[in-house]
Amino acid sequence: MKEYEIVMTYMNACAGEAYPQRSFEEAELAAPADYIRRKHARDFDKFEKEIRPDGRIVYAWRGAVTYIYEFTEL
């Protein structure tokens, strides 16, 4: 298990929100994908995974409602 800082960004364009909502969390995970599966079990396959050059793992689902999860290993 590894410890991650998780930054979750949520934006609902349909509701006319001008600014994204962000939350922060730390968690011990075997894999970041497990966290996404727990939060979005039915929609997991809609998320795109990206590994950034700095090592961050990003899962994003962009649509009328956008979810972006950034995992940084601590």
Place the predicted regions along the sequence by residue:
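A short, charged, amphipathic alpha-helix used as a generic interaction element across diverse proteins
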Residues: 27-48
